[in-house]
Amino acid sequence: MRIVMKFGGALMEDAEQISNCASLVAERAKKDYEVVVSVSAMSNVTDQLVAMGESARLGDMERVRITIAEIEQRHIETAEKLCNENTLCETKENTKKLLETLNQCLTGIFLLRELTPRSKDLLLSFGERLSVGLMRGALIMKGVNAMELTGGEAGIITDSNYGNAKPLLNITEVMVKDRLLPVLKGGVVPVVTGFIGQDENAVITTLGRGGSDYTSTILASALEADEVWIWKDVNGIMTADPKIVSGARTIPTLSYAEVMEMAYFGAKVLHPLTVTPVQERRIPIRIRSAYAPKNPGTIIRETGDKAKIVKAVTSIRGLSIITTGGAGMIGVPSVVSRVFSTLAANNVSVVMISQSSSQANISMLIHNSDLEKALKALKVEFRNGDLVRDIHTIPKVAVVAIVGEGMRGTKGVAARLFNAVAEANGNVLCISQGSSELNISFAVIEEDVDKVVQSIHSAFGLDKA
């Protein structure tokens, strides 16, 4: 059996946790499983790298030196607890070489007083490049032969859209098979950096937010793995955020489509793109707890359990509604096109859309941080006032969504949903539902989110087995 295991930053916090992760790998590797491992940076290191980039750009190299020293001490001390005598020397040497290169990168940013997307990708890559050596050392200590590789060295080839690079899946499949299959056949566990690839010019790129999970499914698809196991510090995917709903439960089974909807609408589980590489090959993804490895967690596959009409309720905070209106919009398709083209040109991401049937107005939910520039751009675009006469906003709102394949063709779901919202004294500001009937999403004032989510969770019996 061939599996890809992914370990996130929360599980790479210290020597004890990394050793625990290595034990999970070793257990399978010693049973003749072919295992590929993908790891994130140690917890908080990526944030430190981001902060150092800003410090260097602003000329504060003293802060940079202090932080590099902290990172070096943490990684060396962790290596000393994880590695045997033979691998410790090598791991220490590699760590110091990487940190020297990191210092050179930051010195360049300091001298130019500029942090380009390409430079930032290089900078952010160091977290994972440092952590793979620790995992390799821990595996060797447990009697597992392992080798470390960057995503690019493993064969993940991307475009050159630095900061959010897209994998070139056809080339990647060929390269990953060529580089990793001989390693696996030789009984070696490849430990691959999550989050990182390289473009066709061998320049390091990053896959954007959620990139480490994405790496694991890219590798699984290319290698035609049997399963992907994404290890986390929770027992799978929950029916709601347990910080909001104390009775939230683990969902045993989800479909690819359901988990993509959940991820898009705020469930902090997987990036929606994570599913894409494995969906066509029908490779299951398991979300499991590294602290309770016997717990089955959640399995994501082609079809979920349709017995439950609604599987989960999710939410996204920190949003604003921006509405464009005017009689001139009626029957003029180009107006909507101009609205979205204007927002796209200003790098404003639209989370949700709701349009009146009269076509006289369209409401869009965007992130609070984008509100000012979106409002300014739309006012400039429609300054003549002949088509769009009114542009108004509602700040501090949130989207709440219910997700489930069982909603398709089931009567009365919307009625139950909005009865639950009313019972929580929530006020629905706008609504959106796609023809797939996989979700119903709506906006409420942000301060009402918790009570609305709790009421919906109870109304659909999500706290019951």
Where are these predicted regions, by residue range?
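Acidic/polar loop patches that form or flank catalytic/metal-binding clefts of enzymes
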Residues: 271, 282-289
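Acidic/polar residues at beta-strand termini and the immediately following turn/coil
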Residues: 241, 289-291
